[in-house]
């Protein structure tokens, strides 16, 4: 991890989990630092992934898990499949990197408010009815946070590779840039 996550106050499990979640979000946000919408949409490898596509995907992912946990999720369309999520990896219409970042920031704020207001991280909600989940299974809010952390971490790694492929910028340099510092070691040493 490129940035330090401060230790939680003794016994503050939810604070620690939220801090690590936000640190992983930061890796994705920083990968977009200084890029135009056009550059962020570039796919510099054989992969279909772009930075703007990853941004939209993680925003939709966090938003949909929060809706599921709060009981406000809309039911999927009849016959919906994983392939229906194709536009979840690209900006369409009037969507921009700035609008997706703002929407993601709002989703992140709602996630934190919901988790902090919960009586316990042991509270559960039902997993969606989807072929990749066991039918009828319930998971805890703790599971939700761990799921979001792993999702963000996976895509922060993708974002690091995509950004370096675009212009050579690496995470340590982007942290320095974000903090208004010059340089930043390519290897963090």
Put a short name on every predicted segment.
Residues 87-127, 139-153:
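Acidic/histidine-rich alpha-helical segments that form the ligand environment
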Residues 12-17, 97-101:
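Active-site rim elements
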Residues 2-8, 14-33, 37-87, 127-189:
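Short, contiguous alpha-helical
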């Amino acid at each position: 991890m490129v940035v330090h996550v401060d230790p939680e106050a003794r016994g503050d499990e939810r604070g620690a989990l939220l801090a690590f979640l936000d640190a992983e979000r930061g890796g994705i946000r920083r990968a977009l630092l200084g890029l135009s919408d056009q550059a962020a949409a570039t796919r510099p490898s054989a992969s279909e992934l772009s930075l703007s596509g990853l941004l939209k995907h993680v925003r939709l992912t966090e938003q949909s898990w929060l809706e599921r946990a709060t009981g406000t999720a809309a039911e999927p369309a009849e016959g919906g499949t994983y392939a229906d999520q194709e536009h979840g990896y690209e900006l369409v219409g009037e969507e921009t990197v700035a609008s997706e970042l703002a929407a993601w920031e709002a989703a992140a704020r709602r996630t934190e408010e919901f988790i902090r207001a919960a009586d316990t991280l042991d509270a559960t909600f039902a997993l969606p009815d989807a072929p990749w989940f066991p039918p009828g299974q319930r998971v805890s809010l703790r599971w939700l946070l761990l799921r979001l952390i792993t999702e963000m971490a996976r895509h922060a790694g993708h974002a690091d590779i995509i950004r370096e492929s675009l212009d050579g910028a690496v995470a340590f340099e982007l942290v320095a840039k974000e903090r208004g510092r010059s340089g930043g070691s390519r290897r963090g040493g």
